[in-house]
Structures are given as structure tokens and as C-alpha cells.
């Protein structure tokens, strides 16, 4: 957890220092920082400092990862040239609603258990169903945008960047699906498992997509 946090923060610093300002850079930076924040939150959950720390860390972690699929949709729109597209505003607004729920609703997260390799977050059955639909729905929407818009792109840079965004999304979506298929009981740990695999996504964002879509300093 802490190693992944350090790597993702290092990638964020690298992107901030090396890539010239652009909307794509800002989205990638936000994604990297939020990924790192979730890893840090898991670290504090596993530290078992106090019930308050565990609850606060769980809430902060969930608020962080809630924005990731929305940023994925926004990044796909941005790379494909659909600046200020209505879908970007809609998914970010939806993400904000979920973040407020996880941050302030008393019963948003019932319990958080550290197993060593990952953290199990216990939500209510309804919250799990709604949140899973939101999260995986946006991931598949990102892949759909990548597929459709990459076929329309005349720019090789944009087309390749969209392809890499699709690869990056699948790099954590597919392994998580395989883990769940093999170990169905891992359902409550999916956020933790997914963000563990997402380090591959972070590397693709920092070293491939960011340099291709924005000039380096």
C-alpha cells in the first residue's frame, strides 16, 4: 500500500514537473493524486490507530476513488477532442454526489477490515448495488468512448492515446474481474483490489498518454 502510494505520488510529481500545462495534464494529475490518496487511506485503515482514524480514512479513500471513473470518461472526451462535453459534466456531478454521501452519510460505510494485502469495505446491500452500477458503468462508458472515437480520429496521436487509455482501463478492470471470478468472496474487497492493479494504469497515464497529448518541458 505505502509502496504503491509512493510510486503514484512520484508519477504525479513527474507529470507535474515534466508536462506542460493542458486540460489533459490536469485530469491525469488529478487521477494520479486520487489513486495515491486511496492507497494512503488504506495504509491508515490497516494501521488501526483508532476507530475515528479508520472511519475517516475509509471515507476519504472512497471519496477519492469515486472520482476516478468520472475522470476516465472526461479524459476520453478530452483526448478525442470533445471539450466541455455534456457527459463530462454529468459524470463529475454524479461523482460529487457519491463523494458527499461517502463523506458525510452516517451509515455510508459500515466497517473496514484490513486483511494485509487488501482492505474489505462493508457497505449496505443497496449502496453496494448502486455504487457498483455507477463505477463499472462509467468504466464501460469510457471503453465505449475509446472504441467509437478512436475510429473517427484523423489524428494518429489522439487515436493512439485513446487506444492506450483503453488498455490502461482494461489493465485493472480485467484482473479484478478474474480475481472476482476465481474468488467470489472478494466482492467487498474489489475497490482495494482494483486500485492495486491500477498502478499499471497510473504508469500508462504518466509515461505514455501525458507526453503524447501534451508537450514536455
Could you describe each region identified by the protein language model?
Residues 13-20, 77-87, 145-163, 209-217:
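Juxtamembrane membrane-water interface segments of multi-pass membrane proteins
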Residues 144-145, 175:
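Amphipathic, well-packed alpha-helical segments that form the structural scaffold of globular domains
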Residues 113-129:
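Juxtamembrane membrane-water interface segments that cap and precede transmembrane helices
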Residues 7-10, 170:
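Glycine/proline-rich, flexible active-site/cofactor-binding loop segments
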Residues 158-217:
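Interfacial "cap-and-anchor" motif at the non-cytosolic start of specific transmembrane alpha-helices
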Residues 1-8, 19-107, 125-140, 188-203:
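Individual alpha-helical transmembrane segments in multi-pass integral membrane proteins
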Residues 12-13, 43, 75, 173, ...:
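Alpha-helical transmembrane segments of multipass membrane proteins
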Amino acid at each position: 500500500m505505502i509502496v504503491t502510494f509512493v510510486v503514484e505520488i512520484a508519477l504525479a510529481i513527474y507529470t507535474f514537473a515534466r508536462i506542460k500545462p493542458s486540460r489533459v495534464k490536469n485530469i491525469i494529475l488529478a487521477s494520479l493524486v486520487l489513486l495515491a490518496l486511496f492507497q494512503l487511506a488504506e495504509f491508515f485503515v490497516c494501521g488501526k490507530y483508532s476507530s475515528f482514524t479508520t472511519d475517516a480514512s475509509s471515507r476519504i479513500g472512497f471519496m477519492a476513488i469515486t472520482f476516478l471513473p468520472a475522470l476516465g470518461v472526461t479524459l476520453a472526451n478530452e483526448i478525442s477532442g470533445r471539450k466541455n462535453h455534456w457527459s463530462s459534466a454529468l459524470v463529475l456531478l454524479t461523482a460529487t454526489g457519491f463523494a458527499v454521501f461517502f463523506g458525510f452519510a452516517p451509515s455510508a460505510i459500515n466497517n473496514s477490515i484490513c486483511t494485509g494485502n487488501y482492505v474489505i469495505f462493508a457497505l449496505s446491500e443497496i449502496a453496494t448495488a448502486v455504487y457498483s452500477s455507477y463505477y463499472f458503468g462509467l468504466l464501460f462508458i469510457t471503453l465505449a468512448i475509446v472504441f467509437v472515437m478512436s475510429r473517427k480520429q484523423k489524428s494518429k496521436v489522439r487515436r493512439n492515446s485513446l487506444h492506450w487509455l483503453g488498455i490502461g482501463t482494461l489493465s485493472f478492470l480485467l484482473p479484478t474481474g478474474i480475481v472476482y471470478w476465481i474468488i467470489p468472496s472478494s466482492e467487498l474487497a474489489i475497490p482495494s483490489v482494483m486500485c492495486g492493479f491500477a498502478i499499471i494504469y497510473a504508469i500508462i497515464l504518466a509515461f505514455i498518454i501525458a507526453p503524447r497529448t501534451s508537450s514536455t518541458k
